[in-house]
């Protein structure tokens, strides 16, 4: 890539000329090297790719036009100093940056920027080190490019797996750092990934480096006197043991936000529990969801249910095991009779509860007796351990996931339809049978009105449930894509009307969801806007992320 070459990206950021872009990119090349810069100048570069080979140009699961959210270039900093230099240049040009870790972010927009023409800042390509694993404190420190699979392999390669487990989401290829700051979940007792972080290092919009919590306390050896750069200085001994530090707790400002660029994070790991047993409880009837959730609530609050368990709809499990055509020749949403037939064929229930027991055998035995006794109140329930199920069963997959072993089997449900793509609709529900049934009824009805099957799961936290509706669609069917847009927008309004809000969403729906958080004349959004404009006066970091826009961007013009 020549320094004198003129680049012509397919799209430019707002208010920036082609000459501005070229001056900016040439300066970037001088910082990171041409091998770490890719300008998107040809439609041949807009390839959807796959989960294992993710694209960084756009959203591969595009519900809008494929190039609706499109980067002008992809830039991969090599280190913290590069990030700081890039931020400085971006301020000079008011050039929008869209930081990513790995860029998978499946179902929520991938690596695509909210503002087309932004530079996607690929934090994970070069910054991919496991910086520390501390056995005594049971934590690790990682850079953005470390995936769950990378961290698992690191533990195994260093003979640490018998001492420490990590917590993994459904798919093992995501960034440990990225998933935590997006407040993703896993399925061990450490399943709330944001809760399990302690200490972050962040490049602010002015280029300054910040460490949060106890990380703001310098090492008493004063390493800066030894000539170390701030990013290379050792952390306080307790930075990754106590997350809050002193004074205002600011970590949340860098979660699902556009207030800074996270370069390092401390994550708690789970000490090997010295015993483990996964299980499946099948619920035969659709209406059993209500009673099951009411049984789950006291068990989860009392911690008899130790991990983050899931209540999965039959079609989520069925879709892991085969596409829709393998079960039915119909293109319409499947009927209750067909769902019953599939459940019988797969020896599953209409709902299927996956959980795990942790600890020595006497502890597991008492917990299992408690759980089994409680669920036995539901007529027709059945109980399974992995060895009771076929080799390809979902329980065999969840058996790995719930002990922190990364897998990729859950990718298969995206192929439920031809040219499969997906979005997640992710409202929060009370751990209440009545609320679960209401939310299920609303989402299922709207899915069917859009001509789609309901595919979903309830992920049970301590006092709430993430209801993850997996909206699978044919991305080459323009009519179906328009229906999916209608479906998402209608579900957002439906849920807001019932007092339910979403915890995370796709790029295209961030504005609408933020507008539902409108108590007291949207004081929450207005406060975030004040902070955004104060810490990022040029609006360079991820404008529009989570519906928070800097003052340079008109809400009327940019809102979707």
Curated annotation (Swiss-Prot):
Q: What triggers or suppresses the expression of this protein?
A: By 4-methoxybenzyl alcohols, anisyl and veratryl alcohols. Repressed by carbon catabolite.
Gene Ontology CC annotation, any one = peroxisome
Q: Where is this site: Important for the catalytic mechanism?
A: 170
Q: How does activity depend on pH?
A: Optimum pH is about 10.
What are the recorded Gene Ontology BP terms?
lactate catabolic process; methanol metabolic process
User: What keywords does the record list, in alphabetical order?
Assistant: Cytoplasm, FAD, Flavoprotein, Methanol utilization, Oxidoreductase, Peroxisome
Entry note: thermal dependence = Optimum temperature is 38 degrees Celsius.
**Reaction(s) catalyzed by this protein?**
4-hydroxy-3-methoxy-benzenemethanol + O2 = vanillin + H2O2
For activity, the cofactor(s) needed are: FAD
Task: Describe how the cofactor binds.
Answer: Binds 1 FAD covalently per subunit.
What residues make up the catalytic site? 108, 503, 504
Q: Where is the FAD-binding PCMH-type domain?
A: 67-272
Q: What is its EC number?
A: 1.1.3.38
* SUPFAM superfamilies, per database record: FAD-binding/transporter-associated domain-like, FAD-linked oxidases, C-terminal domain
What PANTHER family is this protein classified in? ARYL-ALCOHOL OXIDASE VANILLYL-ALCOHOL OXIDASE (AFU_ORTHOLOGUE AFUA_3G09500)-RELATED, D-LACTATE DEHYDROGENASE
Q: Which family does it belong to?
A: To bacterial flavocytochrome p-cresol methyl hydroxylase.
Q: Quote the protein name from its UniProt record.
A: Vanillyl-alcohol oxidase
What gene name does this entry carry? VAOA
